[in-house]
C-alpha cells in the first residue's frame, strides 16, 4: 500500500493508510449511491441497499445482528454516545460509574463530565503489566452502579483485557449495570463475537484504524438496552433515531468493505505481524546492551502494538530524529498529543520510562525492512542523542 519504499510508517494505532480498493469503492459510491437513502424512488432504494450490505458486512465481523449496528462519524463519537447515553438513562436509579484507569480520552473525558453532573466515578488501576484484575473491578460494582467501561485492547501498550470474564463478573454483581467496550483497537485485530460476549451492551469501532477513511465509525447497541439509552441528538429517524442526519453512504460502503477484507485474512495477517513484533523485540533486546531499554507491552499483548522506553532520550526528541529518516512512530495516543502517557502512569511506570516511551504499531502492509530500518534508526539515535 505504501508508494515510497523509503518511507517506514509504523504508527498504525494512530491511523492507517486508506486501502486503494476501499478508496475506489468510496469514489464509485459517491457517483453511484448519490441519492438520499430515506427517499422512496429507485436510486434511493439502491442507496439504502448499499447501507444494508455494509451493515451486514460489519455485523458478521462482530457476531451480532445487523439491526444492532448504528453508524457514527468515528470511534470517539461512538464512545460518547454509549457512555453518556447509558449513564444518563439510568440516573433515576443509580449514579456510580466504574471505569478502567487507562481509557481513551473519548471515554475518560465524558465520564469526568458525568462526574461534574453528580455521578460517582471509580477508576480501577491496572496491574504493572497493564491487565485489569477482574475481581478488583467487580468488587466495586454494587446496586447503585449504572455503567462499567473498559477498552478491549489498549491503544498505547496493546494489552488485551479479558472482556468475557469482566462483563460476566459485572452482570453477576448487578444485572442492570450496562457494560461498554471500546473495541477501536481490537476490531479486525482479534476475533470478536458478541454472541460469546453476551454481557457486553455496547461496543465501538472506527474506520480509520482498519484502512477505511477518517470520519466513519459504528456503535453496537444490544437490543435489550437500546430503549434505555438516551440519544444526545434530536432530529430525523436515521439510525433508528439514535444518530439523526442523512447517512454518509460512500464512507459506510468503505467501512463495510474494510470489514469484509479485514476478516478474510485475519489469521494470516496476525501471523505476519507476530513475526514483525518478534523481530522488533529481538532487536530491542540487542539494543538493551547499548541503552537501558525496557518493554512496557506485556508478552501477551496484541502483536500490532509494542511500547518500550529508552530510559535515556525524551520521546519527542527521538520521534523527531526518526522522522528525519522517514521512520514514523509515536510516543503514545495521538489524541493526547504532547501529554505524558496516562496508561503508563496508571501501570506505575517510573517517570523516566514515561517520558522516554515510544510506541510502534504495525499493520499487515509492514515488512521486515521497516523493522530493520527502525532498529538501525534507534541504534544510531541512541549513540547521537542520549548525551544531549
Listing of model-derived features with the role each one plays in the protein:
Residues 1-388:
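Pyridoxal 5′-phosphate
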